[in-house]
């Protein structure tokens, strides 16, 4: 080859481009080993991209075998800079760094993968493995596996969560990101007894929890699951590969979590880029969906939760649903409300007939100061919030609400206020304060998310975050640290 550096550079670029083409072809041909009922959903939602990472590693092995001078790490470094939207590439890069003994680089690469796709279970598993390898004081993934093998979660046997596209989940989609069907295409009964639902339940019963997020689920990270020997676990058994009830009726779900309308009176940056209110046509479709798909299974439910997608009072659709709920029509039904509290005032309460039905109210706040609230709750008024909190607190004191919780999503912008937030919650007589780490719901670029993700050891304020977690307020009885414990 000529010694001309320009010619050499062009040849190198051409060779690299050809290698990229072959790698992309291998990834494209990769077979997803998940059962067919899950593989189709994985194609669109990408909840487990392990097969893509495996395809990358296999291709690197082939290239190295064919050409011993092939530098797999250098290639992946170059490839990741030009294929920066595929988390599988960064997972593979993290694994290569780990093989080379490069701890900081491995952590940086896997953090990038996580920033690109928050619900990819494989990225999460690799993150936990690499973090423990780099820092043995971190949570040991094998110890967590052993814990899960002896414990049980009732959610896949009880919960039925709707989302805007019609998909149904048996838990929060961030905690168990695998849909079991689509209510716009199938009946609730068919979905609830379907193959996907059965597989998710089997993953609990066999102790693998293979479809659950060990990173985002607070019940897993805080180890608050019931023992597998508990009554809840023994009320379910499997015959011939299918779950059959002993003491529970599994014909229909007992808990409905309605998150199919994203309408909200606020535009919180961690949740959405702009205000979302259902237009007339959308409202009509939502009402038809309610009448045809939700109302028929409501009489079997024992708990309804509104809403994890927007606000129950900021949504005309959900507010209309709340107005038809009453003790006479649904004598066994309890109601959970998840709201920003801006519209939950005396007038809104008077429009409802929920007396004696409200089990839990969770107010999502994320701030203890007006100036921070103005940013994290775009469109909201801190003064209005405080007025409404006083009213809601009085409902709790009067027994109209059985449990009152405040929630806080920790991020770079607000984490300094966590101790003050606990004190604020105590002032209003709150039963529980829920903390969780910020997640990327698709509203942030990878760079923007990295700037807010205070749980990364690479964040310039990470050490200060650890100090805040050790504050006296964060150890008080009403505090649940959620998944924050994983980032210590």
How should each PLM-predicted stretch be described?
Residues 58, 92, 126-129:
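"A position-specific structural signal for the A-helix of alpha-solenoid helical repeats
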Residues 118, 132-186, 259, 280-287, ...:
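Radical SAM enzyme [4Fe-4S]-AdoMet core and its adjacent flexible, acidic
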Residues 179-180, 219-361, 371-389, 395, ...:
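Conserved alpha-helical substructure of the radical SAM core
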């Amino acid at each position: 080859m000529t010694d001309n550096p320009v010619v050499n550079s062009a040849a190198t670029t051409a060779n690299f481009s050809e290698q990229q083409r072959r790698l992309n072809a291998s990834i494209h041909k990769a077979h997803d080993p998940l059962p067919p009922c899950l593989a189709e959903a994985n194609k669109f939602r990408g909840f487990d991209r392990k097969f893509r990472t495996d395809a990358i590693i296999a291709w690197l092995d082939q290239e190295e075998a064919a050409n011993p001078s092939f530098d797999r790490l250098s290639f992946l470094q170059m490839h990741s800079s030009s294929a920066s939207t595929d988390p599988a590439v960064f997972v593979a890069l993290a694994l290569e760094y780990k093989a080379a003994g490069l701890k900081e680089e491995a952590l940086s690469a896997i953090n990038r993968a996580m920033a690109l796709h928050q619900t990819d279970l494989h990225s999460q598993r690799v993150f936990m493995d690499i973090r423990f390898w780099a820092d043995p004081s971190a949570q040991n993934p094998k110890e967590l596996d052993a814990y899960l093998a002896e414990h049980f979660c009732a959610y896949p046997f009880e919960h039925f969560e709707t989302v805007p596209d019609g998909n149904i989940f048996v838990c929060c989609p961030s905690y168990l990101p695998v849909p079991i069907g689509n209510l716009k295409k199938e009946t609730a009964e068919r979905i609830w007894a379907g193959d996907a639902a059965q597989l998710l339940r089997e993953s609990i019963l066999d102790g693998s929890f293979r479809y659950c997020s060990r990173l985002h689920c607070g019940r897993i990270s805080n180890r608050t699951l019931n023992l597998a020997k508990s009554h809840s676990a023994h009320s379910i058994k499997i015959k011939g590969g299918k779950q059959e009830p002993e003491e529970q009726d599994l014909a229909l779900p007992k808990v409905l979590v309605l998150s199919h309308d994203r309408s909200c009176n606020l535009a919180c940056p961690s949740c959405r880029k702009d205000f979302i209110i259902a237009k007339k046509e959308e409202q009509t479709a939502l009402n038809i969906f309610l009448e045809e798909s939700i109302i028929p299974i409501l009489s079997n439910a024992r708990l309804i939760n509104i809403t994890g997608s927007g606000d129950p009072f900021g949504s005309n659709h959900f507010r209309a649903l709340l107005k038809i709920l009453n003790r006479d029509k649904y004598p066994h039904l309890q109601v959970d409300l998840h709201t920003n509290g801006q519209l939950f005032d005396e007038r809104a309460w008077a429009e409802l007939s929920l007396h004696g039905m409200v089990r839990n109210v969770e107010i999502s706040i994320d701030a203890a100061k007006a100036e921070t609230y103005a940013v994290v709750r775009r469109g909201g008024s801190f003064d209005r919030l405080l007025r409404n909190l006083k009213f809601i607190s009085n409902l709790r004191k009067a027994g109209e609400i059985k449990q009152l919780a405040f929630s806080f999503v920790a991020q770079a912008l607000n984490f300094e206020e966590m101790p003050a937030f606990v004190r604020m919650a105590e002032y209003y007589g709150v039963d529980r304060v829920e903390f969780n780490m910020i997640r990327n719901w698709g509203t942030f670029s990878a760079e923007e998310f990295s700037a807010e993700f205070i749980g990364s050891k690479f964040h310039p304020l990470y050490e200060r975050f650890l100090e805040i977690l050790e504050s006296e307020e964060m150890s008080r009885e009403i505090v649940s640290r959620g998944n924050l414990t994983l980032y210590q």
